[in-house]
Amino acid sequence: STIPTNLPEYKIIIPTQTDKDKSISDSAKFYLVTCAPGAAVYERFGHSGIRVHDSVKGIDEVFHWGLFSFDTPNFIGRFIAGNTDYEMGVYTTKFFMLQYIERGSSVYAQELDLTTEQKHELYTKLWNNYRPENRKYRYNFIFDNCATRPYQLIISTYNYKISTNTQQEQITYRDIINKYVPIGLPL
């Protein structure tokens, strides 16, 4: 799911750190945040992000890849055709959580078991993703979205190599999705 960017101006959050101070303490904690689905079309599949909480530096932010604008010309047509550009955002955790509390959706956080070096590496990667030239991307329902972006950053930070069992039954993405999405999903 995503959060529209055309919210009232007072709700738009500016990152709390300047370019000169994008550092964390060694005691910072990182969480994979998963939000339950909501009723709106853009909420139907939930949302994900990465929370950084550092009480020493006063940081408590969620990095997420779910911003878009309904004001985009032909938004619905572009969305259906797979031509929608999304953007990464950085919100205070309080504001991020408020979005889901207001709509009655659950939010789950799983702490990532990172070494001190990995914490600093992931934080650098997050801010690099937020650079103006990196924050926009072409949304893809399967391959490039608010779940795959944090996944790729986390996996690359852990330096994991993931292998799959190639002996499994051949199944299409459509087969997988049809198990979870009712026919005639009200959009």
Task: Annotate the PLM regions.
Residues 2-187:
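Soluble extramembrane regions of membrane proteins in the secretory/endomembrane system
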